Amino acid sequence: MDTDGDNDVFGSGNDTRNNDDKKKEEMKQNISDNSQIISTRDHEADIIGSISKEDLSKIVVRVDRHDALSANDVQSFREAMINFMRDKDPNRNQPSDKLIIAMEVGVYQMVINLGTSAKLGNANNLEFTIAYDQETRTYKVADFVNYMQSRMRNSPNVVRQYARAMEKTINNIRSAGIINSNGVLAAKHGVLASYRNSYSDFAVGFGNDTTDAQLTSLMLARKQALCKGEGGSVEHYNTMQLANLKHPC
């Protein structure tokens, strides 16, 4: 009996199955290899993982806030402020360094008492006075606000953005008792009497050095703003309630 044909058939079948098995194994291996490539092709492995800790420690990153002046813009603001002082001097004299510092502190006091609303540009009846030793200067609030805005047109409400950039300095000077809130703006914004000296309308309450009193005053003002004109009732809230406050009106 000739079995060569059968052997050829069976042999061919075995070869086919073996080839199929090989292809399956190759596919599995390819999938495994690709998965390994994908799993290791992440940001850390490709970039940071190839940098030593020593090199990483040398990297310095600074990202500007979108709602506050950058360090360069703060410098531009100060230069414009000095020019404002010179332009308002009857003899156009350059102000002394001491008077410039007094002016800066005076601006801090102004934004605490009057706030940083763009409407200050229309406050022609309001003035602020600075003095150092025998030097005294008085300026109209509207003149100052409009002058600064005209010099820094790319920064909406530049006085507010400047105050936000200088918030830590303002808080330090306030803590030292050099400047204090008169409480009028805070009261108008619904802040309780015990928190009024901690309130600033330009603060957003995100800083690590933000005190509980500052945060509470800010949230009280937000509560007042949410309910203003909506018939909201007058209520007292504790800090935890305010932190969880959604639109109540």
Swiss-Prot record:
Residues 17-28 have a biased composition (Basic and acidic residues). Its main location: virion. Residues 1-33 are annotated as: Disordered. Keywords: Capsid protein, Helical capsid protein, Virion. The keyword Transcription regulation does not apply. InterPro entries: Closter_coat (IPR002679). It is found in: Virion. GO terms for cellular component: helical viral capsid. Transmembrane segments: none annotated. Belongs to the closteroviridae capsid protein family. Capsid protein self-assembles to form filamentous capsids, about 650-850 nm in length. This is Capsid protein.
